[in-house]
A protein has these predicted regions:
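Active-site-flanking segments in enzyme catalytic domains
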Residues: 2-173
Length: 173
């Protein structure tokens, strides 16, 4: 959460509410966590989701990140409803997926890219494609401290940071 400050936040009436999910420990081995349920179907606004994590993992950070990525994907997809392929995080990522003509599950690619985003890109190591980095920077922004540090590292981050500033200035009108 120190890197992805809005990982467990949902917006309601133009206010961000932090709603951490319940963590279900599964008595198994593995490195992959997953989203059991993004939120309760009767209370989508304030209900806590459920993520499942194996008890015995080689790398707990990877298990938590895959579960968080799955939770983010499911929440964004449910929020966009019928338009999940057209708008928001899932829509923009899906459009990139289609232009690349990739095969397979979009969510699996998203989870892999989210792992790279949180482990490599947050440290300034550029591993993602430019379009994916743009989508993640816009819809899953880093904390302000990380953004300030990254803008001095590479011109691509400086450009993304400048786009953020321009977007903030235009939102005021």
């Amino acid at each position: 959460e120190s890197i992805d400050c809005e990982a467990y936040c949902r917006q309601y009436r133009s206010q961000l509410n932090r709603i951490p999910p319940f963590v279900v420990l599964i008595p198994s081995y593995g490195d992959i966590g997953f989203c059991w349920e993004p939120f309760d179907r009767y209370n989508r606004v304030t209900s806590r989701g459920r993520i499942a994590i194996p008890m015995y993992t080689k790398n707990l950070k990877t298990a938590l990140l895959t579960a968080t990525a799955d939770l983010r994907w499911q929440v964004a997809k449910e929020k966009a409803s019928y338009y999940w392929m057209e708008e928001g995080l899932t829509g923009n990522y899906y459009q990139w997926f289609q232009t690349q003509k990739l095969k397979g599950d979009v969510k699996e690619y998203f989870i892999e890219d989210y792992l790279v985003w949180m482990t490599k890109e947050s440290e300034g190591i550029q591993k993602l494609e430019r379009e994916v980095r743009n989508v993640f920077w816009r819809f899953m922004p880093f904390s302000k401290d990380i953004k300030e540090e990254l803008k001095t590292r590479a011109p691509i981050y400086q450009e993304l940071y400048q786009k953020d500033l321009n977007r903030q200035m235009s939102d005021g009108y």
